[in-house]
């Protein structure tokens, strides 16, 4: 007998069961719909909002700019005081001394600790080794410059998806030769391996270029590029092979600029208000190159509609190994696919490691 003397008929039991199943169906279908929507959206899912496990990319851009500037002050101070304390920390891929100076070390210390003190959870890869006891109390004042506020909206991403790449002094060889126009400090932010924020700072002129993918920038591409007879920019340290192959591909009269520093070379493709900045249409590098040398430039080019790829035209991912073994080809305002196709006929598309 049912409680309180209520007798349930078979029909009543059936109705009750159907109602229960209906409630469960709606709850579960709502859950599945949410999961399916998230799957479809993928990376386009809504901003997760502020939280302990997220970072605002606008803030990260601001601290990256500040880090590049602070590092630049150290670089300039050391050079002007002529207290470089130059030494070799190994060999480059071309067999030359891989030089390090006090400028590299002090810039690295400021840049690394500014970012880590502001965002302790983030993974930061840097060219110079950071000792566990080598701390710096430098802190970010949380100030976001007006030009960033005006262009960039708040956007939160998961902290674990971020990898940062720092080059505290790009073009160290030229720095020791007092060819300071080539010198830059650089910061890059990659999300899930893709470069989305880039900062390139020239310490000796005070010029800073920054850009954020799907956001804004402080720099723009030039009004025109020469696709018929492009000017190429290559490294000073191993220009022989690149010049030969480039002229075989594009003609013996092709103009080729030899320059120091990957940051400087990327800026040569853009509209830079600096009388000492050379201009080119295409940047080529045929040997191994470290990711902290190229990540910032890659992010800036991506944000402005340009491309930086391996010599095979493959996307460069900024996770895992610090080494990009595929060489690189960078352009903007050009048909990048055509460049890859032409060069692949002449270049050894698997960038080779030179004999030491």
From Swiss-Prot:
Names of the cofactor(s): Mg(2+)
Binding of Mg(2+) 2, residues: 167, 170, 293
Membrane topology: Single-pass membrane protein
Compartments where located: Membrane
Keyword Metal-binding part of the UniProt annotation: yes
Record has ATP-binding as a keyword: no
Listed pathway(s): Polyol metabolism; myo-inositol biosynthesis; myo-inositol from D-glucose 6-phosphate: step 2/2
This enzyme's EC code(s): 3.1.3.25
Disulfide-linked positions: none
Binding site residues for substrate: 127, 169-172, 293
An annotated GO cellular component: membrane
Keyword annotations of the record: Hydrolase, Magnesium, Membrane, Metal-binding, Transmembrane, Transmembrane helix
GO biological process: inositol biosynthetic process; phosphatidylinositol phosphate biosynthetic process
Enzyme class, spelled out: hydrolase
One GO molecular-function entry: metal ion binding
Family matches, as Pfam families: Inositol_P (PF00459)
Catalysed transformations (reactions): a myo-inositol phosphate + H2O = myo-inositol + phosphate
Spans through the membrane: 11-31
Binding sites annotated in the UniProt record for Mg(2+) 1: 127, 167, 169
Highest taxon, organism lineage: Eukaryota
Family according to the record: Belongs to the inositol monophosphatase superfamily.
Protein name per the record: Inositol monophosphatase 3
């Amino acid at each position: 007998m049912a409680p309180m003397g209520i007798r349930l008929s078979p029909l009543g039991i059936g109705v009750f069961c159907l109602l229960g199943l209906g409630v469960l169906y709606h709850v579960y279908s709502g859950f599945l719909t949410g999961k399916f929507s998230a799957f479809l959206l993928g990376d386009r899912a809504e901003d997760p909002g502020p939280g302990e496990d997220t970072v605002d990319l606008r803030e990260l851009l601001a601290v990256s700019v500040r880090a590049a500037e602070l590092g630049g002050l150290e670089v300039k101070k050391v050079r002007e005081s002529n207290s470089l304390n130059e030494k070799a920390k190994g060999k480059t891929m071309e067999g030359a001394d891989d030089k390090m100076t006090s400028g590299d070390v002090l810039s690295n210390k400021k840049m690394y600790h500014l970012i880590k003190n502001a965002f302790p959870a983030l993974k930061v890869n840097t060219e110079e080794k950071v000792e566990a006891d080598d701390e710096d109390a430098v802190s970010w004042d949380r100030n976001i410059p007006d030009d960033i506020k005006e262009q960039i909206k708040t956007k939160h991403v998961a902290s674990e998806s971020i990898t940062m790449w720092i080059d505290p002094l790009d073009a160290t060889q030229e720095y020791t030769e007092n060819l300071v126009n080539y010198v830059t400090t650089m910061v890059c932010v990659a999300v899930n391996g893709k470069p989305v924020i880039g900062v390139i700072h020239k310490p000796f002129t005070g010029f800073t270029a920054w850009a954020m993918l799907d956001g804004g920038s402080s720099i723009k591409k030039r009004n025109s590029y020469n696709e018929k007879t492009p000017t190429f920019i290559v490294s000073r340290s191993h220009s022989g092979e690149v010049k030969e192959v480039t002229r075989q591909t594009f003609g013996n009269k092709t103009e080729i600029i030899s320059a120091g520093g990957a940051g400087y070379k990327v800026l040569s493709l853009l509209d830079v208000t600096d009388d000492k900045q050379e201009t080119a249409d295409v940047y080529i590098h045929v040997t191994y190159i470290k990711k902290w040398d190229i990540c910032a430039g890659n992010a800036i080019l991506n944000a402005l509609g340009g491309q930086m790829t391996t010599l095979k035209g493959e996307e460069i991912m900024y996770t895992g190994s610090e080494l990009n073994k595929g060489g690189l080809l960078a352009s903007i305002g050009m048909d990048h696919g055509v460049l890859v196709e032409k060069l692949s006929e002449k270049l050894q598309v698997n960038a080779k490691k030179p004999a030491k």
